[in-house]
Each structure stands twice: as structure tokens, then as C-alpha cells.
Amino acid sequence: MGEAIVITSGKGGVGKTTTSANLGTALAILGKRVCLVDTDIGLRNLDVVMGLENRIIYDLVDVVEGRCKMHQALVKDKRFDDLLYLMPAAQTSDKTAVAPEQIKNMVQELKQEFDYVIIDCPAGIEQGYKNAVSGADKAIVVTTPEISAVRDADRIIGLLEQEENIEPPRLVVNRIRNHLMKNGDTMDIDEIVQHLSIDLLGIVADDDEVIKASNHGEPIAMDPKNRASIAYRNIARRILGESVPLQVLEEQNKGMMAKIKSFFGVRS
């Protein structure tokens, strides 16, 4: 049986959906069967980031309400043979259209067919959040170095730690801009990890190419040379249990990099 990982953040705009798309893509590149599940009912975006929006016939709500079979709603990403699929959210319903138990049952069924079920969680802590975490085994919290984003991440971590069936969450710090961090204009990695007190899974540099790729429906993880792609692929390898040093970012402050490496036990 596979495992389900919910990707959450507490607030919108930190790159949660982009992270979901790229981690799913990276895991598929590594040969794992992956199903991406968009639980942001009424505000779906994962299909656009994946370039699959024109191929949706049925959606998550159709499945739980019995209007179609599970396999009829799954959208196959033909770029990855039989490895990557999307379960789209409904665009015309609201988040109360499904209950947590229904999502949990659906995820359990998906875990029978896939190595990884990546659940893209809506922003906030209301019904959409409850739906998304209901079937998860693990959680990844995405934040950016801004104080407001870290504060919201802290709140979500507190909620996740109350979930009996979810392992302790791990952290991805997204959209790192070295010059701002070096000048003290944003929180540095050490401050973020110490404040949130969870394991650091990976860091992703801010990169305009990520936005361009998402707008074209081609997750940046498909580009083997891009630095953000390398970061996402390394995060995927860590999810698989590999010990992978953090990528050294261009113009990275040496002192900060030493602190980051210490979290992974990597010697400079």
C-alpha cells in the first residue's frame, strides 16, 4: 500500500500548489506511481499547473457522490506513461460538498493503486483543511521566509500535531531570495527552523522560471538543469528515504549555509 502526503501551508500564496505539482512530478521521474489530489473545491488550480485542465471530465465530487467510478475521474499525464495521475477538484461546488470521511475513503482506495498520493490542501483551517488531512499519513508544511507566512505555518503545525494518524510534519522553505536573507530583510533558515521546531525537508530558491513553467502547464521539475527543479527532485529523494545534502544556492551566505547543512549532518 502507498502513502498519502498532504501539502499544506496555513495561508495562500506561498507556493503550496506549485510544490504539490513539482513533488508529484519529481516522484514520477524517480519511477514512482503518483496520484495528485486537488482538494481545493471551487478554486482548483493544480490542473492548470500540470497542464491538464482541458482533459477533465469528472472530478473529486463526482466520485464521492457516486456519479462516476474512481478511474473515470483520474486524468492521466501522458508525459509519464502510467506513473502520474490527477484527481481534480470540482470547480462548481464549495468545500462543504464533501465530508472528511469521504475524502479519507477515497484516499485509502487510491493508496491501493499508487505509491504516493499527494494531497494539495486549500489555504486556511476550515472545512477544506479538514477534508485534506483526513486521509493523510504524512504532512509537508510549505512556508516562505516572511514573518507572516512563518506565523501561519506555526499555527498549521500545531493543528497537524493534534492529528493522531499523521506523522510529525516536515518543512519546505520556498522562494528563498539570498540577498534579502543575507541582509536580514527576511528570516533566515536557522530562525525559521528554530521557530517552527520541525524537521527541514528542503529549501527552494525564488526563480522566475518556476512561474513561467507553471503558466505553461509544465512543472519546473521536468527541467533537469534548473536549480528549483534540482531542489524539488532532491526533496523527492529525501521523501524516498535517501540522505541528500541541501543544494548550495548561488551567492549563498556561507554562514547561513553552514547552519542549514547542520540540520542534515552534512560537513562543509
Curated annotation (Swiss-Prot):
Interacts with MinC and FtsZ. Interacts with MinJ. Disulfide bonds: none annotated. It holds the Pfam family CbiA. Belongs to the ParA family. MinD subfamily. InterPro entries: CobQ/CobB/MinD/ParA_Nub-bd_dom, MinD, MinD_FleN, P-loop_NTPase, ParA/MinD_ATPase. One of its GO terms (molecular function) is ATP binding. SUPFAM superfamilies: P-loop containing nucleoside triphosphate hydrolases. ATPase required for the correct placement of the division site. Cell division inhibitors MinC and MinD act in concert to form an inhibitor capable of blocking formation of the polar Z ring septums. Rapidly oscillates between the poles of the cell to destabilize FtsZ filaments that have formed before they mature into polar Z rings. It comes from the Bacteria. Keywords: ATP-binding, Cell cycle, Cell division, Cell membrane, Membrane, Nucleotide-binding, Septation. One of its GO terms (biological process) is division septum assembly. Signal peptide: none annotated. It is found in: Cell membrane. It is a peripheral membrane protein. This is Septum site-determining protein MinD. ATP binds at residues 11-18. GO terms for cellular component: cytoplasmic side of plasma membrane; cytosol.
